[in-house]
UniProtKB/Swiss-Prot annotation:
Keyword Glycosyltransferase set for record: yes
Name of the featured protein: Queuine tRNA-ribosyltransferase
MF terms (GO), sorted A to Z: metal ion binding; tRNA-guanosine(34) queuine transglycosylase activity
Classification lineage: Bacteria, Bacillati, Cyanobacteriota, Cyanophyceae, Gloeobacterales
UniProt cross-references to HAMAP family, sorted A to Z: Q_tRNA_Tgt
């Protein structure tokens, strides 16, 4: 493993860990929430605004950036860091999630995936080698192996095929990876079948990569099933490497995953709901979301959250934000995105602090209560 990607666990509380993941663009203190900048931008936020939220590491998408503006253009600017002027660590997804999300626009074979580009209708071919080459050109600190993300629900035969293809593609990604200053992570698939999750994890772990991800969750399955799949999968991954849960970012989901040893998270949710006029509030009663379109906020002169240190809460009232939302002003999206991203980064920091003081289970008990235990497929 490249020395610059060392992962150090500094504190433990049960299975929960607080650590530091070293990257060429600085350390990442875990647990860590990563905002999503699909098109090399976290929507409506400048890099300076993003940094002020406490964001440490962000995510960009290989598939979309390969289409627009093209990996060669990004590389010509010195990679993503120079292109988007983000000084901190960056992670790029491989395009594997688009195998799921663009299922009506793609065909899969053992060599790779052919997508039909939504705007032009042009055919775009992605293979493991191409996914790695594009990510090498984009220059992120962490890059992901190309995988097949099956939908939910899916029958066992379909998921088993996705696992076998993911493992074969993974071997090709490892062979194609050329840059020692980028950490390649493998992605565990397997749907809701524990034995398939184990089969996939064992195949990936044998390569001794700098880190591993849990994929194929939050693709339509119920919340209790997400929790169970993560609980089954996390222990299959090396405990001295960072563990990344892809596409998950609510308070409850993060706390539940941290409790079983997950370190990294990403999700589009905080900025997506901000663009629709909603704010996330961090309290003792679990997830809470308020919609500023509601009439009750028109004369509410309090900040969104009186203890939140973000720019939005330091300067503006709910009444002003409600006015911006009702007026469909772009500033509403920016101010709510600042607050929502800051809230999730603050939540991750609170998780870290509780782990360090040995109070994680007590302080986050209201998030750790599970619903009825789902039955996973045999």
């Amino acid at each position: 493993m490249t020395a610059s990607f060392a992962f150090t666990i500094e504190h433990r509380d049960g299975e929960a860990r607080a650590g530091t993941f070293a990257t060429p663009h600085g350390p990442v203190y875990t647990p860590c929430f990563m905002p999503v900048g699909t098109q090399a931008t976290v929507k409506t936020l400048t890099p300076a605004q993003l940094a002020e939220t406490g964001a440490q590491m962000i995510l960009a998408n290989t598939y979309h950036l390969s289409l627009q503006p093209g990996a060669d253009i990004v590389a010509g600017a010195g990679g993503l860091h120079g292109f988007m002027q983000w000084p901190g660590p960056i992670l790029t997804d491989s395009g594997g999630f688009q195998v799921f999300s663009l299922s009506s626009l793609r065909t899969i074979d053992d060599d790779g995936v052919t997508f039909r580009e939504p705007k032009s209708g042009a055919l775009v071919r992605f293979t493991p080698e191409h996914a790695v080459a594009v990510q090498n050109a984009l220059g992120a600190d962490v890059i992901m192996a190309f995988d097949e993300c099956p939908p939910y629900p899916a029958d066992r035969e379909q998921v088993e095929g996705a696992v076998e293809r993911t493992l074969r593609w993974f071997e090709r990604c490892v062979e194609a990876h050329r840059r020692s200053d980028q950490a390649l992570f493998g992605i565990v698939q397997g749907g809701v079948w524990p034995d398939l999750r184990r089969r996939c994890a064992e195949g990936l772990v044998a390569a001794d990569l700098p880190g591993y991800a849990i994929g194929g969750v939050s693709v339509g399955e119920p919340q209790t099933l997400i929790e169970r799949v993560v609980r089954v999968t996390a222990p299959l991954l090396p405990e001295h490497k960072p563990r990344y849960l892809m596409g998950v970012g609510t308070f409850r989901e993060m706390a539940q995953a941290v409790a079983v040893g997950v370190d990294l998270f990403d999700c589009v949710m905080p900025t997506r709901v901000a663009r629709h006029g909603s704010a996330l509030l961090l309290g003792t009663g679990g997830d809470r979301r308020i919609n500023l379109k509601n009439a009750q906020f028109r004369r509410d002169y309090e900040p969104l959250d009186c203890v939140c240190p973000c720019y939005t809460c330091r300067h503006f009232s709910r009444a002003y934000l409600a006015h911006l939302v009702r007026s469909e002003e772009i500033l509403a999206m920016t101010l709510l995105s600042i607050h929502n991203v800051a809230t999730l980064t603050r939540f991750a920091a609170l998780l870290r602090c509780a782990i360090a003081t040995g109070s994680f289970a007590q302080e986050f008990a209201h998030y750790l209560q599970s619903g009825p235990e789902p039955v996973l497929s045999n």
